[in-house]
């Protein structure tokens, strides 16, 4: 009896209707998606997959603040430009933020060898130990360590020099041959930096080093170079016709680095024992630091999103959505929004 009543009910319901809807319910959705064969296909439902917004700020990543270089470049920071001295108080960071046009870089003009490679190495560093590799007061008893200053590296109106390098000069009219070595006992890679001075004239060469035929030799298991100063007049840069070329190497644990010279050495003073961290990096950005926390940082600003894709910037640090160049990316969760109606 129940079965008969159900059949009668269905029959009466069909009789009262003017039309029968075949398939699925249409709606007033204007969502469009691109398919393999068609573009801008209207569908009943879709979800957005693309994050296109950011907060315009530099934020902490997982609670760890970045190292914001301010007016200093990577070169100015790592060499110890006097105007960048305050940066050494920060020993660890989530990432490094550098502005596009940093004013404080190499204060004494010259060439920085393999600079982009150094940036690449530092991009994976999340902390370091800065230490005296050759203590200033005890390492160079036969040379002067206090007169190597210059107006181009001035600090608070006075001539100065890099905080991580020492400009060795003659002492009592002599510049004895020097030989100094360091054994890496840090159990980490150690970044060592030094320079070679190229005076603008022979008079300066004699006055500073008391030799005309100088050389600088630097040797380790993975590095071996001999430098000969090039004495020549050059166009003035920051008031200097001379140049200092800057060099660096990574010293493996238990390896030894040896410096030998009879003039023109800009000696290491401080070096860095490096700790590498997954997810660190260097970004170039004009964004300002804010009291915010994020999982993903871009040069434009931080992204806080659970979406799988973003078009904010291709350079990212942290746990970030995958970058795509698309301006729209939606996934259809419904069907094509074209109903079919059949009249009785």
Swiss-Prot record:
Residues 1-17 form the signal peptide. It comes from the Viruses. It is found in: Virion membrane; Host apical cell membrane. In natural infection, inactive HA is matured into HA1 and HA2 outside the cell by one or more trypsin-like, arginine-specific endoprotease secreted by the bronchial epithelial cells. One identified protease that may be involved in this process is secreted in lungs by club cells. Homotrimer of disulfide-linked HA1-HA2. Belongs to the influenza viruses hemagglutinin family. Binds to sialic acid-containing receptors on the cell surface, bringing about the attachment of the virus particle to the cell. This attachment induces virion internalization of about two third of the virus particles through clathrin-dependent endocytosis and about one third through a clathrin- and caveolin-independent pathway. Plays a major role in the determination of host range restriction and virulence. Class I viral fusion protein. This is Hemagglutinin. It comes from Influenza A virus (strain A/Harbin/1/1988 H1N2). The lineage of its organism: Viruses, Riboviria, Orthornavirae, Negarnaviricota, Polyploviricotina.
């Amino acid at each position: 009896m129940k079965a008969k009543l159900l059949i009668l009910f269905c029959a009466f319901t069909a009789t009262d209707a003017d039309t029968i809807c075949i398939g699925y319910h249409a709606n007033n959705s204007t969502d469009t998606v691109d398919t393999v064969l068609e573009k801008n296909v209207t569908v009943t439902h879709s979800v957005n997959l693309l994050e296109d917004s950011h907060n315009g700020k530099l934020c902490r990543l997982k609670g760890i603040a970045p190292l914001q270089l301010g007016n200093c470049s990577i070169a100015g920071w790592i060499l110890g430009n006097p105007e960048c001295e305050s940066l050494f108080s920060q020993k660890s960071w989530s990432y490094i933020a550098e502005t596009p046009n940093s004013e404080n870089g190499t204060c004494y003009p010259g060439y920085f060898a393999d600079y982009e490679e150094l940036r690449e190495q530092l991009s994976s560093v999340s902390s370091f130990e800065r230490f005296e590799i050759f203590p200033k007061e005890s390492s160079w008893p036969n040379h002067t360590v206090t007169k190597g200053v210059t107006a181009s590296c001035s600090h608070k109106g006075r001539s100065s020099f890099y905080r991580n390098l020492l400009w060795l000069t003659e002492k009592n009219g002599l510049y004895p041959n020097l030989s100094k070595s360091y054994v890496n006992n840090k159990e980490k890679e150690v970044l060592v930096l030094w320079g070679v001075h190229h005076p603008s004239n022979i008079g300066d060469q004699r006055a500073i080093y008391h030799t005309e035929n100088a050389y600088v030799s630097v040797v380790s298991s993975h590095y071996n170079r001999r430098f000969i100063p090039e004495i020549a007049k050059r166009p003035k840069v920051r008031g200097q016709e001379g140049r200092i070329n800057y060099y660096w190497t990574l010293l493996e644990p238990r390896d030894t680095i040896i410096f030998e010279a009879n003039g023109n050495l800009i000696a290491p003073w401080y070096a860095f024992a490096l700790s590498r961290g997954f997810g660190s990096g260097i970004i170039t950005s004009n964004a300002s630091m804010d009291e915010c926390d994020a999982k993903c940082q871009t040069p434009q600003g931080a992204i806080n999103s659970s979406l799988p894709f973003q078009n904010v910037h291709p350079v990212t640090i942290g746990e970030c959505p995958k970058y795509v160049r698309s301006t729209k990316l939606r996934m259809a969760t419904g069907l094509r929004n074209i109903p079919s109606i059949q009249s009785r």
